[in-house]
């Protein structure tokens, strides 16, 4: 549905500025002053935290004021209701039981001032920015590709900040703050849209965003109103059985009904809510009400009639009414002057719009100001009758309401049925009398239609109660039976709505927020969860981000109230929202939503998020946020490491026997190296860091990626082993370390010994192949060349001696380090000492395989060192070491490797024979 023109939710009246010829004629002389006086009697802005009844059908009044309510009996629960502990229904209104003095004093005061102050009530609790700030913000936003998205990005963090700031006992203050945040953004987006160039696609997106946020704002408003009342009702069960007295007046009967019947009360809250939405929009046309310069109605017709009297001899060009009483056009079936007819239509449209917004008093003021005090009086008859003097008393008190309200209502019903009247005039009196059939034709939007149904439902239920509880003297005339005997339910209203023939209403009925509003009104949480599930399965992550935010916070709100939400759906909503936050890089928000998932899912979800975090500082920040959110940080970091390690499905591969000792480090390897950072932030995780580091290094060693393994080793803090022992001692443990930790420490030392041996061999190998070159002398060398040769030879001998000395030192060092690996203490290299550890078949298999991969190769390298440095006899001693039953190194050699070792030992024996020694290196006895 095209939403490119959203300034807000439309009312049944076209609210563009309509200035008639009469208005234009007088506008040069006098304009309506629109004052911003919030102290005006009728100008008090509507607090966002409460929905105050503004409709003539608002039957709720003094019976629900705080002074007349019983004290709460469960203060521990009622704290949820906020500081006042009262539902919005406890507020006085201008409804059926309202303060008469506010309406009966129909003076000539400028009603427009009140109108303006109502406009100033829009988003009253939002943070007000200075004009300069707004201009600067709007200017910046206009440069964005999607100004609406850019302007509203802060809402994600704002909502979380508000959520964390409030406890479960101030949940309704939290909802009010949600509404205020939305209202603030609506103000900003409205300014952006108003300054935008028409037709640009990016601003149509902004308009759509504006509409979404407006819908969210009013949905939070509805939520607070309904659930505050529902909680209040659960605390005040005694009101369920309230019954009016025998001689109770209409007003008293209705008071009791509202106390007793939650359907009537909450239906009225829906009416109030819908009227508050319309009231927010009322300012769009309030500046253009300039019907008359004086309080004279039908002045053009009056002028024409006077002219005809003066020029009666000239005849009349067209028929006009000849009398100017209110009933004249209908009675005479003659028209007014064209200008007056135009003004009359506009006036009636404005009046209906005011009635739709619950501003009956303002509608009466407008009538009086336009010279139609009689019409203002017709809007007065809905007030419920009450005579406080019936019960006696020393002082005579004024009578309230209309004793002939029933006759007035029947007259309104008949007027609404009369097709001779304008459709908006009929709709006005249809709204006052509960005539749904005549009210619906002017209701073009979802909000207007729902308002019509609920207003009529409340009106009908109240009227039924009055008819059964109040003694009447004259029953000769009754309202239609279908009205008086209607069996209204909330479900029936929405069934009727689904069956409407208005295409726009049907389309709006399928919009996300209207579906949410429907289920909130019905109080059907399970149905709402089912809808959420459908949306996720159909659209998933393509749902608007702000809608996902709303869905998430709505679920959290319902959970706070102790209401059951379907676990599977709630989890999917949270997971989808978390994925949105990840994709939009709201990294600081993710932990606090993840903690609302079940623990195993929370660990998996947050670990998945952390896999994509690569910067060291950001990693540290994410872990700190996880701690604040009470997530299991240790399990999460362990899971991150395991997840990344599992991405490599490569198997352990056997080393070839080439002298090349290292394979290049890939990007995948780099991820595994860096993942260890997750485990070193917290000293309490050093044992886990050791275990995971060992697992990664085992893979690297098997693939001859010694440099990569070395980088992992460096990631582990040097004091890790000492830290593990210290933490164990701090716990007051006198027993040895857990077997898993003990074995991990030993494995870590094994890997360190192996890496040190390889690093030293690399140095030896490099030095061995960088021997100084002996100079040569040409046979026909000159004397000068011979002298130069002698200098080069002396330098060579000096360099060779230095090289030889360094080589001997490196040889001794590398021999020691290699023997440390081959003859590793307490059972051998990569062999666990503690056998009481938890069984880990994969680790055991890898360690056995590493012995078979690394020890034979290291033995061959040691032979190369010894053979290259002329230590042939020691070469032969390798056979004793390999065959030793103490170390059992022969078990890690394959037949091919043993054959190759024997071949190398044979070469060393031949060198000994060339030196005149026996094959084992001993002198030959003569």
From Swiss-Prot:
Transmembrane segments: none annotated. It holds the Pfam family Nup84_Nup100. The modification Asymmetric dimethylarginine is found at residue 60. It is found in: Nucleus membrane; Nucleus, Nuclear pore complex; Chromosome, Centromere, Kinetochore. The modification Phosphoserine is found at residues 4, 10-11, 57-58, 70, 87. GO terms for molecular function: structural constituent of nuclear pore. The modification Omega-N-methylarginine is found at residues 60, 69. The modification Phosphothreonine is found at residues 46, 55, 65. Belongs to the nucleoporin Nup84/Nup107 family. This is Nuclear pore complex protein Nup107. It comes from Mus musculus.
């Amino acid at each position: 549905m095209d939403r490119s023109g959203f300034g807000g939710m439309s009312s049944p009246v076209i609210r563009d500025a309509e200035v008639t010829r009469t208005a234009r004629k007088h506008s040069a002389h006098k304009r309506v002053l629109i004052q911003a006086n919030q102290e005006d009697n009728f100008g008090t802005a509507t607090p966002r935290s409460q929905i105050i009844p503004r409709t003539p059908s608002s039957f709720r009044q003094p019976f629900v004021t705080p002074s007349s309510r019983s004290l709460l009996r469960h203060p521990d629960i009622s704290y949820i209701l906020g500081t006042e502990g009262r539902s919005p229904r406890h507020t006085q209104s201008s409804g059926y039981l309202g303060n008469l003095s506010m309406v009966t004093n129909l003076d000539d005061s400028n009603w427009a001032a009140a109108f303006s102050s109502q406009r100033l009530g829009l988003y009253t609790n939002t943070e007000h920015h200075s004009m300069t700030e707004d201009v600067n913000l709007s200017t910046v936003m206009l440069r964005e590709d999607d100004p609406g998205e850019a302007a509203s990005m802060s809402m994600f963090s704002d909502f979380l900040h508000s959520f964390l700031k409030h406890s479960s006992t101030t949940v309704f203050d939290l909802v009010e703050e949600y509404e205020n945040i939305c209202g603030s953004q609506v103000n900003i987006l409205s300014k952006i849209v108003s300054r935008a160039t028409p037709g640009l696609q990016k601003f149509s997106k902004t308009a759509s965003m504006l509409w979404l946020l407006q819908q969210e704002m009013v949905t939070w408003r509805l939520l607070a109103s309904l659930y505050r009342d529902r909680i209040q009702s659960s605390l005040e069960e005694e009101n369920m059985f309230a019954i009016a007295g025998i001689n109770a007046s209409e007003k008293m009967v209705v008071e009791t009904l509202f106390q007793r019947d939650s359907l009537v009360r909450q239906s009225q809250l829906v009416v109030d809510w819908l009227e508050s939405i319309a009231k927010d929009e009322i300012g769009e046309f309030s500046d253009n009400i300039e019907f008359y310069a004086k309080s004279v109605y039908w002045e053009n017709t009056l002028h024409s009639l006077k002219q005809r009297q003066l020029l009666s001899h000239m005849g009349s060009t067209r028929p006009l009414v000849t009398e100017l009483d209110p009933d004249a056009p209908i009675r005479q079936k003659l028209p007014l002057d064209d200008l007056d007819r135009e003004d009359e239509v506009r006036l009636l449209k404005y009046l209906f719009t005011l009635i739709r917004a619950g501003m009956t008093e303002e509608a009466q003021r407008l009538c009086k100001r336009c010279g139609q005090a009689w019409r203002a009086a017709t809007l007065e008859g809905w007030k419920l009758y009450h005579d406080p003097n019936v019960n006696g008393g020393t002082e005579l008190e004024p009578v309230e309401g209309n004793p002939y309200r029933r006759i007035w209502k029947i007259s309104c019903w008949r007027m609404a049925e009369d097709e001779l009247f304008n459709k908006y005039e009929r709709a006005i009196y249809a709204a006052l009398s509960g005539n749904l059939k005549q009210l619906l034709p002017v209701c073009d939007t979802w909000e207007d239609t729902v308002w019509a149904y609920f207003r009529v439902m409340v009106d009908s239920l109240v009227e039924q109660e009055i008819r059964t509880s109040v003694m009447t003297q004259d029953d000769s005339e009754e309202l239609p039976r279908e009205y008086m005997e209607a069996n209204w339910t909330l479900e029936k209203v929405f069934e009727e709505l689904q069956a409407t023939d208005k295409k726009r209403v049907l389309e709006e009925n399928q919009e996300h927020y209207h579906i949410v509003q429907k289920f909130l009104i019905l109080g059907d949480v399970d149905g709402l969860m089912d809808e959420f599930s459908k949306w996720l399965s159909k659209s998933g992550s393509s749902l608007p981000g702000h809608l996902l935010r709303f869905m998430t916070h709505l679920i959290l709100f319902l959970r706070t109230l102790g209401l059951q939400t379907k676990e599977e759906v709630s989890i999917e909503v949270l997971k989808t929202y978390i994925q949105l936050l990840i994709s939009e890089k709201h990294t600081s928000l993710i932990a606090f939503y993840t903690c609302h998932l079940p623990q195993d899912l929370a660990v998996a979800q947050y670990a998945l998020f952390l896999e994509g975090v690569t910067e060291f500082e950001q990693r540290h920040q994410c872990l700190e946020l996880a701690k604040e959110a009470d997530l299991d940080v240790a399990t999460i970091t362990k899971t991150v490491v395991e997840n990344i390690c599992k991405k490599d499905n490569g198997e352990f591969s056997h080393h070839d026997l080439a002298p090349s000792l290292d394979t290049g480090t890939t990007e995948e390897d780099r991820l595994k190296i860096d993942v260890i950072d997750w485990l070193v932030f917290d000293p309490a995780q050093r044992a886990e860091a050791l275990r995971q580091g060992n697992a990664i290094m085992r893979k690297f060693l098997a693939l001859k990626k010694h440099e990569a393994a070395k980088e992992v080793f460096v990631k582990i803090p040097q004091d890790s082993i000492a830290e593990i022992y210290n933490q164990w001692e701090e716990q007051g443990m006198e027993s040895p370390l857990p077997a898993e930790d003990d074995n991990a420490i030993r494995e870590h030392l094994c890997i360190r010994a192996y890496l040190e041996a390889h690093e030293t061999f690399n140095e030896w190998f490099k030095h061995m192949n960088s021997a100084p070159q002996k100079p040569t002398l040409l046979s026909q060398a000159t004397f000068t060349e011979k002298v130069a040769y002698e200098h080069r030879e002396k330098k060579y001998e000096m360099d060779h001696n230095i090289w030889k000395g360094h080589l001997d030192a490196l040889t001794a060092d590398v021999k020691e380090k290699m023997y440390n690996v081959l003859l590793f203490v307490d059972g051998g290299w990569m062999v666990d000492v503690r056998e009481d550890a938890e069984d880990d078949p994969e680790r055991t298999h890898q360690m056995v395989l590493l012995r078979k991969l690394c020890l034979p190769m290291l033995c061959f390298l040691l032979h190369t060192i010894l053979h290259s440095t002329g230590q042939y006899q020691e070469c032969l001693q390798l056979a004793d070491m390999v065959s030793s039953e103490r170390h059992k190194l022969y078990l890690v050699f394959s037949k091919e490797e043993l054959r190759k070792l024997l071949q190398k030992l044979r070469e060393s024996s031949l060198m000994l024979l060339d030196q005149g020694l026996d094959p084992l290196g001993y002198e030959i006895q003569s």
